[in-house]
Amino acid sequence: MGQDTDMLNTYQQLVRTPSVRPGQDVRLQAPGTRTGLLKLLSTVSQDKQGCLGSGDGVPNQDLQQRSQSSRQTAKKDRKPRGQSKKGQGSEESEDHFPLLPRKPSFPFQWAWESIATDVRAVLQPSSPTPGHQALPMPSSFSQRQSRRKSTANLPEAHGCCWKTEAQNLKARQQLGAWGGVSIPTGKGELGSEPPSGLQLPGRRPGSGSASDKQVQLQSLGAEEAERGLSSGVLPQRPRRGSISEEEQFSEATEEAEEGEHRTPCRRRAGCQRKGQISGEEASDEGEVQGQSQGSSPSFNNLRRRQWRKTRAKELQGPWDLEKLHRQLQRDLDCGPQKLPWKTLRAAFQASKRNGKAYASGYDETFVSANLPNRTFHKRQEATRSLLQAWERQRQEERQQAELRRARTQHVQRQVAHCLAAYAPRGSRGPGAAQRKLEELRRQERQRFAEYQAELQGIQHRVQARPFLFQQAMQANARLTVTRRFSQVLSALGLDEEQLLSEAGKVDREGTPRKPRSHRSMGVRMEHSPQRPPRTEPTGSQPDRHYNPSLDPECSP
């Protein structure tokens, strides 16, 4: 009876202890699952608790049947999550205990029954003295401690897998509440060491060594269950019978170490894949960086070399015109219908060996592109037209290059001819200056002779028209004499018109006739617009005019 009171006090302490700790994350604890469960367990009557305090650690038949039904219900709930295997302990218990209909009970009673059955399975192989047997810490409490440590020590550098874990947080909490088994929420939870054990008050330090080992074994079993759930396999309970406690502890430790090595490797591989993707995105700028933690430099060098080879092949590309030209010539030689299937298969295998099949769906594309169907003929015709256009372009470029070369040679020949014409043969001799001076004098004499010939031509042209020149000179002389005669008459005070009329009368009466030329010239002068009354402006007329004025008959 005292042991029952001690167990009740222990569970009341466990109820109060996690609720007052300040560092506990309230979000990771579903309301009403564990704290309410332990409160309800603390109020269970003494006859229900008497079966646990009997000293042998084995519950009664009713508790075994209800725990068996609760395990079956929990396994049915876990089956939709991808777990199809069953534990060995459940198969043995199904053989021994028949299935009975479940009695109505308080909420989450089956969770506590599974915890009690796990405790019984752990305590059965080695049971020390009944009076000093320590009650192991429940897996829910160790789970809360490990989860609190993991959430407190979770590094920010491992944020690559945080989105996926945050999305499945509700599912993990629900699964942990059903089976009392936690699922790791990050890398820090697997890496954190489980608590060594909970020493109950009032016990001696030496008497709790077996309970410490059992608590460590239970925490390692919880971690193994977490790893099994994460890998998709049901956790198996420790085998009963001839296996001792030390063998169980060593096996659990080895499995825990292997699981801790496997899980970071898996996560490291996922981070490496993310790093490879980000490195391929940054490879266009020439920066290949490994985003994963723990990736070796040799792996980065290998990735860089592979990327360079792929990049070189992509730069070489399928549009190598020489290769297309050769392939087109082969197709034209053998014909599209004569292309055998073995040649297609050999070409396909060669392309796969060369690494040209980048995607998984490239195989069908390659086969359908090389089969002699309508698409193949259209593609071949397009390739042929492309090659013909390329050949025409190359021929035009060749012709233009030849034309440019011929034009350049012609210009060079002209320049050489001009230089040879302007540079005398012996221009580099000792008498070059004298010869140059003689050449200049010869050119000057030649130019002077040309000028003299031009002047002689002008003179010959003037002499060929003498009448025109004479008429011009006579007209100029006549105008000058008439102007002078008018000035003299005006100075003497004589009337020019009266004098001209009298002179005309005298001329008609007795003067001999003058030459025809003079008369004609006088007539022309009378009809001139300047002085119409003037007649016969010859040199003998003034003497004839002055003579009558000197005559005594005409004098006043």
Curated annotation (Swiss-Prot):
Coiled-coil residue windows: 379-464
Residue ranges of the region described as Disordered: 1-31, 50-102, 123-155, 179-309, 503-556
Statement: the UniProt record of this protein carries the keyword Coiled coil: yes
Domain of life: Eukaryota
PANTHER family: PROTEIN FAM-161, TESTIS-SPECIFIC PROTEIN 10-INTERACTING PROTEIN
A GO BP annotation: cilium organization
Lineage, opening ranks: Eukaryota, Metazoa, Chordata, Craniata, Vertebrata
Transmembrane segments: none
The protein's name: Testis-specific protein 10-interacting protein
Keyword tRNA-binding appears in the UniProt entry: no
Composition-biased stretches (Acidic residues): 244-258
Keyword terms: Coiled coil
GO CC terms: cytoskeleton; photoreceptor connecting cilium
Biased composition (Polar residues): 1-16, 208-219, 289-301
